[in-house]
Structure formats: structure tokens, C-alpha cells
Amino acid sequence: MTIAIGSTYQEKRTWFDDADDWLRQDRFVFVGWSGLLLFPCAYFALGGWFTGTTFVTSWYTHGLATSYLEGCNFLTAAVSTPANSMAHSLLFLWGPEAQGDFTRWCQLGGLWTFVALHGSFGLIGFMLRQFEIARSVNLRPYNAIAFSAPIAVFVSVFLIYPLGQSGWFFAPSFGVAAIFRFILFFQGFHNWTLNPFHMMGVAGVLGAALLCAIHGATVENTLFEDGDGANTFRAFNPTQAEETYSMVTANRFWSQIFGVAFSNKRWLHFFMLLVPVTGLWMSAIGVVGLALNLRAYDFVSQEIRAAEDPEFETFYTKNILLNEGIRAWMAAQDQPHERLVFPEEVLPRGNAL
């Protein structure tokens, strides 16, 4: 048997190894494998949105002016959804609708599908970026897991909901006032505010804001700095690197306030992670239900009684009336291509039915 002394086995490097080294090397802005998805998609999504809000009209899809060029401002400009007749077409520039004509593609609403799809994959790339960097510095992946919540909301609202409806037309347009209109649409056609999944989402977001405020205030309240001086205001020095707040003092404070308090930082911060993420995921699940036109909390008995007894009215029946008004006014305004004409007898009256 022959033994080679002084030689070591070295695996042959491939192009993949070279690419891996370049993508993951330490630089000011980390690229990584996730960057191959994140950076192009984010660039195209933002570029498409800025292009649409600056130059592109929605006259051919919604009968609206939605660009700076037409006189809109930041709050009223938008990249609008495609025409209802486009259904669920991906509206590729080279597809049968636009046939390579960029102007026609913009007129049909192609920029909306462009922004929505690149935006979705850009968000997913950002989550993968958090996984990748956490892996490289030996951290747990909770940041990426938390970021799955806003991704779930984006995908459910902008993609899954219109997929359950007749077309992309019923998704939100990408603009501030456009999102407000979509919220009113959700209320009028789905009674969204009374949906338990929406309630859980509100509880999660507002509860997280409350937890964030309480946590920040408590840490500031219990800051200390080593020393014998009576004046502890120096503890607010923002450049001090060490952890300088007292968990014991915070625990005692909230035990006196509420009677209960978090006993360790791990459970406290996990709870601060759990509340908003769970809330956003629940709201995303609720929107998936709306995509299928599922309804929740229709108190029909109150509606029937309100119809029979003009003196009986609840906040629920008043809201049902408001929803009817939203539908009656919005449907004709929002879907002019349907040429809807509502006779007087179907417009909202003075009771729930």
C-alpha cells in the first residue's frame, strides 16, 4: 500500500463555488443568493410604480385620472388595476392583449400586474435575505418568520382576493386614495369590519403598538448608570453600549400596576413578536375567506325585526344600511362598464331591509 505524505485532498472548485463566494462576501450592501431575487424585483416594482403614478392614465380601465401628468398629487395618484374585461390575464407586454405595444400595455393596466407580481417576489426575496443573513451570522430566523406576516397580507389582498373574484379589476390599485376606496369597497360588499378575522388583525396591530409603547417607556423608566450619584439622568446617554436597565425594577413596577408582569425578557419579547404576527396572519386568512365570498356575523334576526318594527334599530342594522348605500352608490360609479341602473325601490330605505 502506498501512502502519499505531505499531500492533502482538495475538492475541485466549480463556477458555483466562485458565484457563492462573490455573492456572500462581506461588503457594504450584502447581496447573497436572495439578492438575485430581491434587487431586480424591488427595482422593477418601484420603477413600475413611479412610472405609472407619473405618466399613466386610468381612463381606459376605470375612467379616472391617476397620474401626476393629469393633475393628481401624491395622495390621489395610483397604478390602477386592469380593466374588468382582462379577467385574470397576466398581461405580459408580449401577450395577445398588448402585442408588444408599450403604450397599449399601459392603457390596459399592464403596469398593475407588473408591480403586483414583482412586488410579491421582492417581498419574498427580502424575507429570504433575512434567512440568509441570519444563517451566516448564526442567528435564529425569527426576523424572517415575523416578516412572513406582512407578506401574507400583501399576497392575500393583492393576489388571492382578486383571483377569487372575476378579475384583477377588483384588487386594490397602488395608491393612497385608491387603497381608501378599496377599504370602503370591502366594508360595503363584505361587511369586513364585523369579520372576526379583521377583529383579530386589529387586536394584533393595535395590541402590538401598545406593547411597543409600554416596553419602550418601561425600559426608559428603568435605565440606570453605574455610579454613586443621586442624579440618574445621565443614564439616557445614547452612546452607552452596555445594557443598563433593570428587569427586576420593571417587573416590580408592573406587578404593582396590573398584579402580573413578565418575569423574563425571553417571554416578553416573544410575546411582542407573537401578537402582531398572529394578528396579521389572521387578517390574511380572513381576506382569503372574502376571496371566496364567505360571510361572517350576519345577524339576520335583527335585520328582520328592524324591517318589521320601525322603532327597532341597532348599531348593526344601521351599519347594514350604510353598506347598502355603499353598494348602491359604488357599484355604478366603480363599474361603469356594467351600465348599472338602480330603480328607486332597491335604494336604501329607513330600516335594515
Swiss-Prot record:
GO molecular function: chlorophyll binding; electron transporter, transferring electrons within the cyclic electron transport pathway of photosynthesis activity; iron ion binding; oxygen evolving activity
Chain positions with N-acetylthreonine modification: 2
Superkingdom as given in the UniProt entry: Eukaryota
SUPFAM superfamilies the record matches: Bacterial photosystem II reaction centre, L and M subunits (SSF81483)
Catalysed reaction equations from the record: 2 a plastoquinone + 4 hnu + 2 H2O = 2 a plastoquinol + O2
Lineage: Eukaryota, Viridiplantae, Chlorophyta, core chlorophytes, Chlorophyceae
Protein name listed in UniProt: Photosystem II D2 protein
Species of provenance: Tetradesmus obliquus (Green alga)
Extra remark beyond the main annotation: 2 of the reaction center chlorophylls (ChlD1 and ChlD2) are entirely coordinated by water.
Binding site for chlorophyll a ChlzD2: 118
Binding site for Fe cation: 215, 269
Residues reported to bind pheophytin a: 130, 143
Keywords: Acetylation, Chlorophyll, Chloroplast, Chromophore, Electron transport, Iron, Magnesium, Membrane, Metal-binding, Oxidoreductase, Phosphoprotein, Photosynthesis, Photosystem II, Plastid, Thylakoid, Transmembrane, Transmembrane helix, Transport
UniProt binding sites for a plastoquinone: 215, 262
Primary site of residence: plastid
GO cellular component: chloroplast thylakoid membrane; photosystem II
Modified sites of kind Phosphothreonine: 2
Compartments it resides in: Plastid, Chloroplast thylakoid membrane
BP terms from Gene Ontology: photosynthetic electron transport in photosystem II
UniProt remark on cofactor binding: The D1/D2 heterodimer binds P680, chlorophylls that are the primary electron donor of PSII, and subsequent electron acceptors. It shares a non-heme iron and each subunit binds pheophytin, quinone, additional chlorophylls, carotenoids and lipids. There is also a Cl(-1) ion associated with D1 and D2, which is required for oxygen evolution. The PSII complex binds additional chlorophylls, carotenoids and specific lipids.
Positions of chlorophyll a PD2 binding: 198
Quaternary organization: PSII is composed of 1 copy each of membrane proteins PsbA, PsbB, PsbC, PsbD, PsbE, PsbF, PsbH, PsbI, PsbJ, PsbK, PsbL, PsbM, PsbT, PsbX, PsbY, PsbZ, Psb30/Ycf12, at least 3 peripheral proteins of the oxygen-evolving complex and a large number of cofactors. It forms dimeric complexes.
Known role: Photosystem II (PSII) is a light-driven water:plastoquinone oxidoreductase that uses light energy to abstract electrons from H(2)O, generating O(2) and a proton gradient subsequently used for ATP formation. It consists of a core antenna complex that captures photons, and an electron transfer chain that converts photonic excitation into a charge separation. The D1/D2 (PsbA/PsbD) reaction center heterodimer binds P680, the primary electron donor of PSII as well as several subsequent electron acceptors. D2 is needed for assembly of a stable PSII complex.
The keyword Thylakoid appears for this protein: yes
CDD domains with a match to the protein in the record: Photosystem-II_D2
